[in-house]
Protein backbone atom coordinates (compact mmCIF):
# COMPACT_ATOMS: atom_id res chain seq x y z
CA UNK A 1 0.00 0.00 0.00
CA UNK A 2 2.78 2.36 0.90
CA UNK A 3 4.39 1.47 -2.37
CA UNK A 4 1.20 2.34 -4.29
CA UNK A 5 0.92 5.71 -2.52
CA UNK A 6 4.51 6.43 -3.27
CA UNK A 7 4.04 5.61 -6.95
CA UNK A 8 0.83 7.66 -7.05
CA UNK A 9 2.55 10.66 -5.52
CA UNK A 10 5.46 10.22 -7.90
CA UNK A 11 3.15 10.13 -10.94
CA UNK A 12 1.30 13.20 -9.68
CA UNK A 13 4.52 15.12 -9.22
CA UNK A 14 5.76 13.98 -12.64
CA UNK A 15 2.56 15.16 -14.33
CA UNK A 16 2.74 18.43 -12.43
CA UNK A 17 6.29 18.97 -13.58
CA UNK A 18 5.29 18.28 -17.18
CA UNK A 19 2.44 20.78 -16.93
CA UNK A 20 4.80 23.35 -15.42
CA UNK A 21 7.41 22.70 -18.12
CA UNK A 22 4.77 23.06 -20.84
CA UNK A 23 3.47 26.30 -19.31
CA UNK A 24 6.96 27.74 -18.97
CA UNK A 25 7.72 26.81 -22.58
CA UNK A 26 4.66 28.70 -23.78
CA UNK A 27 5.61 31.73 -21.68
CA UNK A 28 9.19 31.67 -23.02
CA UNK A 29 7.96 31.44 -26.62
CA UNK A 30 5.52 34.34 -26.09
CA UNK A 31 8.19 36.51 -24.45
CA UNK A 32 10.69 35.70 -27.22
CA UNK A 33 8.10 36.56 -29.88
CA UNK A 34 7.33 39.88 -28.20
CA UNK A 35 11.03 40.71 -27.93
CA UNK A 36 11.60 39.83 -31.61
CA UNK A 37 8.65 41.99 -32.63
CA UNK A 38 9.95 44.93 -30.59
CA UNK A 39 13.47 44.56 -32.00
CA UNK A 40 12.21 44.40 -35.60
CA UNK A 41 9.89 47.36 -35.04
CA UNK A 42 12.63 49.51 -33.54
CA UNK A 43 15.05 48.50 -36.31
CA UNK A 44 12.57 49.39 -39.06
CA UNK A 45 11.67 52.65 -37.35
CA UNK A 46 15.33 53.62 -37.03
CA UNK A 47 15.88 52.70 -40.70
CA UNK A 48 12.99 54.90 -41.80
CA UNK A 49 14.14 57.77 -39.59
CA UNK A 50 17.66 57.38 -40.96
CA UNK A 51 16.35 57.78 -44.52
CA UNK A 52 14.30 60.75 -43.43
CA UNK A 53 17.09 62.52 -41.55
CA UNK A 54 20.13 61.71 -43.65
CA UNK A 55 18.92 61.09 -47.19
CA UNK A 56 15.34 62.08 -47.75
CA UNK A 57 14.97 65.81 -48.20
CA UNK A 58 11.48 65.61 -49.64
CA UNK A 59 9.83 68.98 -49.27
CA UNK A 60 6.10 69.61 -49.28
CA UNK A 61 5.37 71.62 -52.41
CA UNK A 62 2.83 73.83 -50.69
CA UNK A 63 4.61 74.58 -47.42
CA UNK A 64 7.41 77.07 -46.88
CA UNK A 65 10.59 75.30 -45.80
CA UNK A 66 13.55 76.63 -43.84
CA UNK A 67 15.78 74.71 -46.26
CA UNK A 68 14.79 77.22 -48.91
CA UNK A 69 15.58 80.26 -46.75
CA UNK A 70 12.01 81.58 -47.15
CA UNK A 71 11.78 80.21 -50.71
CA UNK A 72 8.51 78.43 -51.40
CA UNK A 73 8.99 75.43 -53.71
CA UNK A 74 7.12 75.75 -57.00
CA UNK A 75 5.42 78.93 -55.82
CA UNK A 76 4.79 79.98 -59.44
CA UNK A 77 2.81 76.79 -60.04
CA UNK A 78 -0.91 76.41 -59.62
CA UNK A 79 -2.40 73.24 -58.22
CA UNK A 80 -2.35 71.03 -61.30
CA UNK A 81 -1.93 67.46 -62.49
CA UNK A 82 1.74 67.89 -63.42
CA UNK A 83 2.62 69.34 -60.02
CA UNK A 84 0.72 66.60 -58.19
CA UNK A 85 2.32 63.81 -60.19
CA UNK A 86 5.79 65.22 -59.66
CA UNK A 87 5.15 65.65 -55.92
CA UNK A 88 3.83 62.10 -55.60
CA UNK A 89 6.78 60.75 -57.57
CA UNK A 90 9.35 62.50 -55.36
CA UNK A 91 7.54 61.30 -52.24
CA UNK A 92 7.59 57.76 -53.60
CA UNK A 93 11.28 57.54 -54.50
CA UNK A 94 12.35 59.10 -51.21
CA UNK A 95 10.24 56.63 -49.23
CA UNK A 96 12.05 53.74 -47.56
CA UNK A 97 10.03 51.13 -49.47
CA UNK A 98 10.75 52.58 -52.94
CA UNK A 99 13.92 54.46 -52.13
CA UNK A 100 16.13 55.51 -55.05
CA UNK A 101 19.75 56.25 -54.04
CA UNK A 102 20.65 59.88 -54.61
CA UNK A 103 23.42 58.92 -57.05
CA UNK A 104 20.69 57.54 -59.34
CA UNK A 105 18.45 60.60 -59.14
CA UNK A 106 19.03 62.23 -62.52
CA UNK A 107 16.80 64.72 -64.35
CA UNK A 108 17.45 65.91 -67.91
CA UNK A 109 16.01 69.13 -69.34
CA UNK A 110 15.86 70.40 -72.88
CA UNK A 111 16.83 74.08 -73.10
CA UNK A 112 15.01 76.28 -75.66
CA UNK A 113 11.28 76.23 -75.00
CA UNK A 114 11.65 74.10 -71.88
CA UNK A 115 13.47 76.33 -69.41
CA UNK A 116 14.37 79.24 -71.72
CA UNK A 117 12.50 81.39 -74.21
CA UNK A 118 12.51 80.18 -77.82
CA UNK A 119 9.89 82.30 -79.60
CA UNK A 120 11.06 85.91 -79.35
CA UNK A 121 10.92 85.50 -82.22
CA UNK A 122 13.17 82.44 -82.67
CA UNK A 123 15.85 80.34 -80.94
CA UNK A 124 18.60 82.34 -79.25
CA UNK A 125 21.41 80.89 -81.38
CA UNK A 126 19.45 81.73 -84.55
CA UNK A 127 19.04 85.31 -83.34
CA UNK A 128 22.76 85.36 -82.65
CA UNK A 129 23.46 84.11 -86.19
CA UNK A 130 21.22 86.81 -87.68
CA UNK A 131 22.80 89.53 -85.54
CA UNK A 132 26.32 88.47 -86.48
CA UNK A 133 25.52 88.61 -90.21
CA UNK A 134 23.34 91.74 -90.42
CA UNK A 135 24.10 93.87 -87.37
CA UNK A 136 27.78 93.36 -86.62
CA UNK A 137 29.67 96.03 -88.57
CA UNK A 138 33.00 94.38 -87.75
CA UNK A 139 32.09 91.17 -89.54
CA UNK A 140 31.99 90.55 -93.29
CA UNK A 141 29.60 87.65 -93.98
CA UNK A 142 29.77 85.32 -96.94
CA UNK A 143 26.99 85.22 -99.52
CA UNK A 144 25.89 81.87 -98.16
CA UNK A 145 25.65 83.30 -94.64
CA UNK A 146 23.57 86.23 -95.93
CA UNK A 147 21.20 83.80 -97.61
CA UNK A 148 20.82 81.75 -94.44
CA UNK A 149 20.31 84.89 -92.34
CA UNK A 150 17.56 85.96 -94.75
CA UNK A 151 15.90 82.58 -94.20
CA UNK A 152 16.15 83.13 -90.45
CA UNK A 153 14.40 86.48 -90.85
CA UNK A 154 11.64 84.83 -92.85
CA UNK A 155 11.25 82.20 -90.14
CA UNK A 156 10.99 84.93 -87.52
CA UNK A 157 8.10 86.46 -89.45
CA UNK A 158 6.10 83.28 -90.01
CA UNK A 159 6.99 81.54 -86.75
CA UNK A 160 8.15 78.33 -88.41
CA UNK A 161 11.62 76.78 -88.66
CA UNK A 162 12.12 74.36 -91.54
CA UNK A 163 14.32 71.28 -91.40
CA UNK A 164 16.38 72.79 -94.21
CA UNK A 165 17.06 75.92 -92.16
CA UNK A 166 18.07 73.85 -89.14
CA UNK A 167 20.52 71.95 -91.33
CA UNK A 168 21.95 75.14 -92.88
CA UNK A 169 22.37 76.98 -89.58
CA UNK A 170 23.87 73.94 -87.87
CA UNK A 171 26.46 73.25 -90.57
CA UNK A 172 27.60 76.86 -91.07
CA UNK A 173 27.44 78.17 -87.50
CA UNK A 174 31.15 77.68 -86.64
CA UNK A 175 32.23 79.72 -89.68
CA UNK A 176 30.80 82.83 -88.01
CA UNK A 177 33.41 82.58 -85.26
CA UNK A 178 36.51 81.44 -87.13
CA UNK A 179 38.53 84.43 -85.87
CA UNK A 180 37.35 84.08 -82.26
CA UNK A 181 38.98 82.06 -79.51
CA UNK A 182 36.59 80.48 -77.02
CA UNK A 183 36.90 83.36 -74.54
CA UNK A 184 36.04 85.91 -77.27
CA UNK A 185 33.08 83.79 -78.35
CA UNK A 186 31.71 83.58 -74.82
CA UNK A 187 32.11 87.34 -74.31
CA UNK A 188 30.29 88.03 -77.58
CA UNK A 189 27.37 85.91 -76.42
CA UNK A 190 27.26 87.60 -73.02
CA UNK A 191 27.19 91.04 -74.67
CA UNK A 192 24.41 89.86 -76.99
CA UNK A 193 22.16 88.48 -74.26
CA UNK A 194 22.67 91.59 -72.12
CA UNK A 195 20.36 93.47 -74.51
CA UNK A 196 16.56 93.72 -74.15
CA UNK A 197 14.18 91.12 -75.53
CA UNK A 198 12.52 92.55 -78.60
CA UNK A 199 9.00 91.45 -77.76
CA UNK A 200 8.87 92.07 -74.00
CA UNK A 201 9.15 94.91 -71.53
CA UNK A 202 11.47 94.61 -68.51
CA UNK A 203 13.24 91.53 -69.82
CA UNK A 204 16.76 91.04 -71.15
CA UNK A 205 17.57 88.21 -73.52
CA UNK A 206 19.76 86.49 -70.95
CA UNK A 207 17.07 86.66 -68.26
CA UNK A 208 14.40 84.97 -70.37
CA UNK A 209 14.21 81.84 -68.23
CA UNK A 210 10.84 80.38 -67.31
CA UNK A 211 10.55 81.09 -63.61
CA UNK A 212 8.38 78.02 -62.84
CA UNK A 213 10.97 75.74 -64.44
CA UNK A 214 13.85 77.30 -62.50
CA UNK A 215 11.84 76.71 -59.32
CA UNK A 216 11.34 73.11 -60.42
CA UNK A 217 15.08 72.65 -60.97
CA UNK A 218 15.80 74.02 -57.49
CA UNK A 219 13.13 71.78 -56.01
CA UNK A 220 14.70 68.70 -57.59
CA UNK A 221 18.17 69.72 -56.44
CA UNK A 222 16.87 69.98 -52.88
CA UNK A 223 15.79 66.38 -53.28
CA UNK A 224 19.32 65.35 -54.34
CA UNK A 225 18.73 65.23 -58.08
CA UNK A 226 21.60 65.80 -60.48
CA UNK A 227 20.42 68.23 -63.16
CA UNK A 228 21.54 67.98 -66.79
CA UNK A 229 20.70 70.06 -69.85
CA UNK A 230 20.45 68.38 -73.25
CA UNK A 231 20.01 70.95 -76.02
CA UNK A 232 20.11 70.87 -79.79
CA UNK A 233 21.89 74.22 -79.68
CA UNK A 234 25.67 74.59 -79.65
CA UNK A 235 27.01 73.51 -76.27
CA UNK A 236 29.28 76.48 -75.39
CA UNK A 237 26.50 78.93 -76.29
CA UNK A 238 24.10 77.16 -73.93
CA UNK A 239 26.72 77.05 -71.17
CA UNK A 240 27.32 80.78 -71.56
CA UNK A 241 23.63 81.68 -71.42
CA UNK A 242 23.07 79.51 -68.34
CA UNK A 243 26.16 80.81 -66.52
CA UNK A 244 25.13 83.13 -63.70
CA UNK A 245 21.43 82.43 -64.16
CA UNK A 246 20.96 78.77 -63.24
CA UNK A 247 23.19 76.81 -60.88
CA UNK A 248 24.10 73.97 -63.23
CA UNK A 249 27.80 73.15 -63.76
CA UNK A 250 29.15 73.40 -67.35
CA UNK A 251 30.01 69.70 -67.24
CA UNK A 252 26.29 68.91 -66.96
CA UNK A 253 25.38 70.69 -70.20
CA UNK A 254 25.13 68.61 -73.36
CA UNK A 255 24.63 70.18 -76.79
CA UNK A 256 25.56 70.06 -80.44
CA UNK A 257 29.31 70.25 -80.89
CA UNK A 258 31.85 71.47 -83.40
CA UNK A 259 35.51 70.61 -83.70
CA UNK A 260 37.75 72.77 -81.53
CA UNK A 261 41.40 73.16 -82.49
CA UNK A 262 44.46 75.00 -81.23
CA UNK A 263 45.20 78.31 -82.96
CA UNK A 264 48.39 77.07 -84.64
CA UNK A 265 47.28 73.50 -85.18
CA UNK A 266 46.31 73.91 -88.83
CA UNK A 267 45.53 70.61 -90.53
CA UNK A 268 47.51 68.53 -88.03
CA UNK A 269 45.40 66.00 -86.13
CA UNK A 270 44.92 66.70 -82.45
CA UNK A 271 46.60 63.49 -81.37
CA UNK A 272 49.67 64.48 -83.39
CA UNK A 273 49.86 68.15 -82.35
CA UNK A 274 51.73 69.57 -79.34
CA UNK A 275 50.02 72.47 -77.58
CA UNK A 276 52.13 75.64 -77.25
CA UNK A 277 51.21 77.38 -74.00
CA UNK A 278 52.77 80.68 -75.18
CA UNK A 279 51.03 81.11 -78.53
CA UNK A 280 48.04 78.76 -78.68
CA UNK A 281 44.44 79.35 -77.73
CA UNK A 282 41.40 77.35 -78.78
CA UNK A 283 38.70 78.07 -81.33
CA UNK A 284 36.12 76.40 -83.56
CA UNK A 285 37.29 74.57 -86.61
CA UNK A 286 35.03 74.97 -89.64
CA UNK A 287 33.68 71.47 -89.42
CA UNK A 288 30.63 69.89 -87.88
CA UNK A 289 31.25 67.37 -85.14
CA UNK A 290 27.98 66.05 -83.64
CA UNK A 291 24.38 67.20 -83.56
CA UNK A 292 22.34 66.72 -80.41
CA UNK A 293 18.89 66.19 -81.86
CA UNK A 294 16.41 63.34 -81.57
CA UNK A 295 18.09 59.98 -80.89
CA UNK A 296 21.43 61.74 -80.51
CA UNK A 297 20.04 63.16 -77.26
CA UNK A 298 19.82 59.61 -75.94
CA UNK A 299 23.33 58.87 -77.19
CA UNK A 300 24.57 62.02 -75.44
CA UNK A 301 22.97 60.85 -72.19
CA UNK A 302 24.62 57.44 -72.51
CA UNK A 303 28.02 58.95 -73.33
CA UNK A 304 28.14 61.79 -70.85
CA UNK A 305 25.92 60.77 -67.96
CA UNK A 306 26.30 57.01 -68.11
CA UNK A 307 23.06 56.37 -66.24
CA UNK A 308 19.39 56.21 -67.12
CA UNK A 309 17.55 59.41 -66.04
CA UNK A 310 14.50 59.26 -63.81
CA UNK A 311 12.93 62.43 -65.21
CA UNK A 312 12.98 64.18 -68.59
CA UNK A 313 11.52 67.60 -69.44
CA UNK A 314 11.07 68.77 -73.02
CA UNK A 315 8.73 70.76 -75.23
CA UNK A 316 8.96 69.54 -78.81
CA UNK A 317 9.09 66.62 -81.19
CA UNK A 318 12.88 66.67 -80.95
CA UNK A 319 12.61 65.73 -77.28
CA UNK A 320 10.32 62.74 -77.85
CA UNK A 321 13.19 60.26 -78.10
CA UNK A 322 14.64 61.01 -74.68
CA UNK A 323 11.10 61.23 -73.27
CA UNK A 324 10.40 57.68 -74.37
CA UNK A 325 13.87 56.61 -73.26
CA UNK A 326 13.32 57.74 -69.67
CA UNK A 327 10.06 55.80 -69.52
CA UNK A 328 11.95 52.67 -70.56
CA UNK A 329 14.14 52.71 -67.44
CA UNK A 330 14.55 49.08 -66.35
CA UNK A 331 15.71 49.90 -62.81
CA UNK A 332 13.29 52.60 -61.65
CA UNK A 333 10.02 54.08 -62.91
CA UNK A 334 10.59 57.21 -65.00
CA UNK A 335 8.42 60.18 -65.95
CA UNK A 336 8.47 62.50 -68.97
CA UNK A 337 7.00 66.01 -68.88
CA UNK A 338 6.33 68.25 -71.90
CA UNK A 339 5.93 72.04 -71.79
CA UNK A 340 2.94 73.19 -73.86
CA UNK A 341 3.35 76.81 -74.98
CA UNK A 342 -0.36 77.71 -74.95
CA UNK A 343 -0.37 81.19 -73.39
CA UNK A 344 -0.34 83.93 -76.03
CA UNK A 345 -1.13 86.56 -73.42
CA UNK A 346 2.14 86.23 -71.53
CA UNK A 347 4.35 84.44 -74.08
CA UNK A 348 4.72 84.14 -77.85
CA UNK A 349 3.17 80.79 -78.63
CA UNK A 350 2.04 78.57 -81.45
CA UNK A 351 -1.29 77.35 -80.13
CA UNK A 352 -1.63 74.70 -82.82
CA UNK A 353 1.72 73.17 -81.82
CA UNK A 354 0.74 73.32 -78.16
CA UNK A 355 -2.51 71.45 -78.80
CA UNK A 356 -0.66 68.86 -80.87
CA UNK A 357 1.81 68.34 -78.02
CA UNK A 358 -1.08 67.75 -75.62
CA UNK A 359 -2.39 65.06 -77.96
CA UNK A 360 1.08 63.53 -78.23
CA UNK A 361 1.27 63.43 -74.43
CA UNK A 362 -1.97 61.43 -74.28
CA UNK A 363 -0.71 58.96 -76.88
CA UNK A 364 2.72 58.45 -75.34
CA UNK A 365 2.04 58.66 -71.62
CA UNK A 366 3.92 61.94 -71.18
CA UNK A 367 2.69 64.52 -68.68
CA UNK A 368 1.74 67.89 -70.23
CA UNK A 369 2.60 71.17 -68.51
CA UNK A 370 0.37 74.06 -69.60
CA UNK A 371 1.89 77.54 -69.43
CA UNK A 372 -1.62 79.00 -69.40
CA UNK A 373 -3.29 76.72 -66.87
CA UNK A 374 -0.43 75.54 -64.65
CA UNK A 375 1.76 78.63 -64.10
CA UNK A 376 0.92 81.83 -62.23
CA UNK A 377 3.72 83.65 -64.07
CA UNK A 378 6.22 82.91 -66.83
CA UNK A 379 9.04 85.45 -66.52
CA UNK A 380 7.86 87.35 -63.44
CA UNK A 381 5.00 89.70 -62.76
CA UNK A 382 6.85 92.79 -64.01
CA UNK A 383 7.56 91.30 -67.45
CA UNK A 384 4.96 92.29 -70.03
CA UNK A 385 4.55 91.01 -73.55
CA UNK A 386 4.43 93.85 -76.09
Model-found features: residue ranges?
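Non-catalytic pre-domain segments flanking phosphatase-related domains
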Residues: 21-22, 35-111, 119, 123-126, ...
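A metal-dependent, Asp-based hydrolase signature
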Residues: 56-57, 120-206, 211
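N-terminal intrinsically disordered, acidic low-complexity segments at the extreme N-terminus
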Residues: 1-6
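N-terminal Sec-pathway targeting helices
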Residues: 13-29
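C-terminal cap/substrate-recognition subdomain and adjoining C-terminal extension
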Residues: 7, 12-16, 51-72, 99, ...
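Electropositive phosphate-/nucleotide-binding environments in soluble metabolic enzymes
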Residues: 80, 179, 295
Amino acid sequence: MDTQKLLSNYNFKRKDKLRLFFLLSIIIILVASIICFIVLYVKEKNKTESYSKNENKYINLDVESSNYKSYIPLSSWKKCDAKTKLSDYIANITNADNYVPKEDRIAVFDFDGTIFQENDPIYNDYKLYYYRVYNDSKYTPTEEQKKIAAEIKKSMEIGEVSDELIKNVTTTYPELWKDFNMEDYEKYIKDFIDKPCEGFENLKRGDAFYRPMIELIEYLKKNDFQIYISSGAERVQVRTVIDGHVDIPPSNIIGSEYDIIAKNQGSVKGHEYTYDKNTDDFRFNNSFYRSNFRTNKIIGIIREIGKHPLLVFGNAHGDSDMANYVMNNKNYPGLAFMICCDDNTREKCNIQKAEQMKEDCKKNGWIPISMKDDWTTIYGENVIKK
